[in-house]
Every structure is written in C-alpha cells, then in structure tokens.
Curated annotation (Swiss-Prot):
UniProt organism field: Chlamydia muridarum (strain MoPn / Nigg)
Reaction equation(s) it catalyzes: sn-glycerol 3-phosphate + NAD(+) = dihydroxyacetone phosphate + NADH + H(+); sn-glycerol 3-phosphate + NADP(+) = dihydroxyacetone phosphate + NADPH + H(+)
Residue numbers annotated as active site: K192 (proton acceptor)
Family: Belongs to the NAD-dependent glycerol-3-phosphate dehydrogenase family.
Cellular compartment(s): Cytoplasm
Keywords noted in UniProt: Cytoplasm, Lipid biosynthesis, Lipid metabolism, NAD, NADP, Nucleotide-binding, Oxidoreductase, Phospholipid biosynthesis, Phospholipid metabolism
Annotated protein name in UniProt: Glycerol-3-phosphate dehydrogenase [NAD(P)+]
Binding site for NADPH: W13, R33, K106, A141, R256, V280, E282
Chain positions recorded as sn-glycerol 3-phosphate binding sites: K106, G137, S139, K192, D245, S255, R256, N257
The organism's taxonomic lineage, starting at the top: Bacteria, Pseudomonadati, Chlamydiota, Chlamydiia, Chlamydiales
Underlying gene: gpsA
Function comment: Catalyzes the reduction of the glycolytic intermediate dihydroxyacetone phosphate (DHAP) to sn-glycerol 3-phosphate (G3P), the key precursor for phospholipid synthesis.
GO cellular component: cytosol
Pfam family, one: NAD_Gly3P_dh_N
The enzyme's E.C. designation: 1.1.1.94
Recorded metabolic or biological pathway in which this protein acts: Membrane lipid metabolism; glycerophospholipid metabolism
Length: 334
C-alpha cells in the first residue's frame, strides 16, 4: 500500500527521510515553518544542506500544516526535541490522531523529563498510543540521502500500526527491524548523544581508539542501566537502537554531538561550540534531563554526570577526566 505522508520538519534529517519515502513510491508533503526554506525547496527543488540531491516529483512542500495533512494516511515528524511540543500542539489544534504518527527525533524534553513519545501521549491522550510509532537506529542523514545501506528499528504499541509503518519505510537498502519496546528504542536514541559528547572530548585530546572504545562500552552500560530501571528491555539497548546508534554517533565524522565534544576539548565554550556548529546539538539538552532523572532514581552514571558537570557546572574538562579515571574499578556487569 502506498501512503500519503505528511512530514513535519525539513531539516537535514527530516529531508533525508522524506526523500527516502518519496523514492519508495509514497506521496509526501514536507512541512516547515520557515517560508524561505519552503520557497527554495519548492521553486529551486534543492535543500540548502544537500543541493546535490535531486528531489523526486512526488515530494512537495508547504508551510501550511493544514495543507500538509490534507488526505494524509500517515504523519512523520522530524523536528528537534525542543520543537516537538509546539509542533504537536499545532497538530492537535488541527486534528485528533486517527492515523499513524511516527516520531524520528531523539531526545528528552527539558524540565519535564518526558520522552518525545510521552509528550505525544500527553497532548493527544492515552488512546493515541494505538497510532504512535518510533523510528531510531544508526542513520546518518547524509548516508541515507546517498542510498547507502542502513539498518534501523521501528517500534509501536499496536501491531497493525507497526506493520503499516514498517512497510512504508522498508526499502532494499533501508532495512527496518520491528521492536515492541518503544520506550527502550526512544531512550537509546536520546542517551547516546551524551556519550557521544564524551567521545568527542576524547577525540579532542587525542586519547586514541582504546579510550574511545572504553567510553562507548561503559557508556552503553550506563544507558542499559538507566533504561532497565525505567522499565525497558535490556536487550533493546544491545541492538540497533542502543549499541548500533551509539557506535555510529560516537565514531562518525558527521556527528554533531561528537564534534561538539571535540570543540570543547579544543577550548571552545559550550555556547561557542553550538554557534560554530550552527545546528541543534541534542546531547547538550539530554545531558541535563538525564542527569536530573538519574539523580532522582539514584542511578550511577559517571560519564553522563561528567558531561553534565562540564556543561552546566563549569567543571574543568581535565579535572572531569581525572575524576573518571580515578574511580574504583568493579565488576563489569556487561
């Protein structure tokens, strides 16, 4: 079945998936608030971050959410975590959720500590869980645009919704694996960004691959421990939504979070690094939310805590590294 898809958010990630869905034969209408971006996409048929990509004719664009939703059989969102609530509130003002809503962003809302899926349920109500889906996994936008092989997971509460979303996204090169642990999928995608900042700091100090692999492995342990206490399945974090996404984000030259950490090690302040990158660095905000939740539940997360203290308590990076290296070694548990 071919879908008519409203795609909310036309940043690099949103555009890459909208392009993939259109190339998979679906009619896609991309929505963004920025009128100049929509004008460029519509008239020049180019995305400013990917001018080399040919936009298929069945991918159109609008700055009117009502127009994007007209006739839609599926909604996909690709906005930042900070933009999630206002976009969903706008969506709620137009329609009740009666078709699948696929969340593709990764993060935890500041102040509330809610996952993006939990924001959706708060806005649309618990019955909307039937239509909720979550896509996550190792998926760098530029590689998705090039059609490189990629494996991700799709999670949903309702089996029929899961099947519909799975069929919409699956292509010969975009491998989609079902996973029923939606909360675990969401947490893996959010928390890995914090570990990626730590790995970027390691890169900036040229600590080498051994140190980075140690951070990834111990970081995965932190993510698994956090997710398990939150009621998720530990094996979810061993898969694409956890380990897979963590590896890609920490080792990719295209990762904003890793680049951000590297800039911190090179002497930039967090604000300077964010300005230089020029795009949202989700790990900065997730570090705060994750630290608050971990503190409340008494979860020991030394890497996450270290990143939080560097970003929000002005901890000297060298001192933070020394504190990590001086911790007692105990049973690995992995």
């Amino acid at each position: 079945m071919k879908e008519t898809i409203a795609y909310l958010g036309m940043g690099m990630w949103g555009f890459s998936l909208a392009n993939l869905l259109a190339n998979n034969g679906h009619r896609v209408v991309g929505w963004a608030r920025n009128p100049s971006l929509i004008e460029q996409l519509s008239t020049q048929r180019q995305h400013p971050a990917a001018p080399h990509v040919t936009i298929p004719s069945n991918l159109s664009f609008t700055s009117s959410m009502e127009e994007a939703l007209d006739g839609a059989t599926m909604i996909v969102e690709g906005v930042t975590s900070a933009g999630m609530r206002p976009v969903l509130n706008q969506l709620k003002s137009i329609t009740d959720l009666q078709i699948p809503l696929v969340i593709t962003s990764k993060g935890i809302e500041q102040n509330t500590g809610l996952l993006l899926s939990e924001i959706a349920l708060e806005i649309f109500g618990k019955p909307a869980a039937k239509y909720l889906g979550y896509l996550s996994g190792p998926s760098i936008a530029s590689e998705v645009l090039r059609g490189c092989p990629c494996s991700v997971v799709i999670s949903a509460y309702d089996p029929a919704t899961l099947k519909q979303i799975h069929q919409a996204f699956l292509t010969p090169t975009f491998r989609v694996y079902p996973n029923s642990d939606l909360k675990g999928v969401a947490l893996g995608g959010a928390l890995k960004n914090v570990i990626a900042i730590a790995c970027g700091i390691s890169d900036g100090f040229r600590f080498g691959d051994n140190a980075k692999s140690g951070l990834v492995t111990r970081g995965l342990h932190e993510i698994r421990k956090f997710a398990t206490i939150m009621g998720c399945r530990p094996d979810t974090l061993n898969g694409l939504a956890g380990l897979g996404d963590l590896c890609t984000t920490c080792f990719s030259a295209f990762s904003r979070n890793t680049l951000f950490g590297k800039m911190l090690a090179e002497g930039l302040t967090p604000e300077q690094a964010k300005t230089k990158i020029g795009m949202v660095v989700e790990g900065v905000y997730t570090a705060l939310s994750a630290h608050q939740i971990a503190t409340h539940h008494k979860i020991d997360m030394p890497i996450t805590t270290g990143v939080y203290r560097v970003l929000y308590e002005n901890l000297d990076i060298q001192k933070g590294i020394a504190q990590l290296l001086q911790r007692n070694t105990k049973e690995e548990y992995l």
